[in-house]
């Protein structure tokens, strides 16, 4: 780590952390060591920013469990939201014409895909092992995008 002008290490002010394979283990849970490290950093005044490909409500659930109150970067960076009130601080939408084209490709190719409209994330999947009743809040299974 670099040092400042006075030779001291600069104080860490922000840690951005991914969920899958970083904060969450293979079982999609947070280890005790990771939870303690995040809580210690929050207690020391460090801003913890979750940055993930996942949708907001899943990232928020993790933030809430750890006491993280900094904005959440989610949806592969296309959305930044406040975990406190859900306010959208940044939202990058795919233009309608391109979204329709992408949906048609996913439907025709029978690809698994997700699309978020408002606060609902739609999961296009044909996998028989997906139980719609067990999907996280804010996610619905669909047969077409």
Feature annotation, model-predicted:
Residues 7, 24-27, 45, 88:
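Residues at structural and domain junctions
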Residues 137-145:
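Anionic-ligand binding region
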Residues 1-13:
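Extreme N-terminus of proteins, especially the signal/transit-peptide cleavage junction
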Residues 32-136:
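Active-site phosphate-binding/coordination module
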């Amino acid at each position: 780590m670099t040092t400042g002008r006075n030779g001291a290490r600069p104080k860490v002010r922000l840690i951005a952390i991914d969920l899958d394979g970083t904060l969450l283990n293979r079982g999609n849970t947070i280890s005790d060591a990771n939870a303690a490290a995040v809580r210690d950093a929050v207690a020391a005044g460090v801003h913890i920013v979750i940055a993930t490909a996942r949708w907001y409500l899943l990232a928020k659930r993790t933030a809430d469990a750890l006491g993280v109150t900094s904005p959440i970067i989610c949806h592969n960076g296309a959305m930044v939201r406040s975990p406190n009130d859900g306010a959208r601080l940044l939202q990058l939408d795919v233009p309608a014409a391109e979204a329709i084209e992408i949906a048609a490709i996913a439907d025709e190719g029978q690809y698994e895909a997700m699309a978020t409209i408002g606060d609902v994330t739609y999961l296009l999947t044909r996998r028989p092992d997906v139980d719609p009743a067990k999907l996280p809040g804010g996610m619905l299974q669909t047969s077409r995008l």
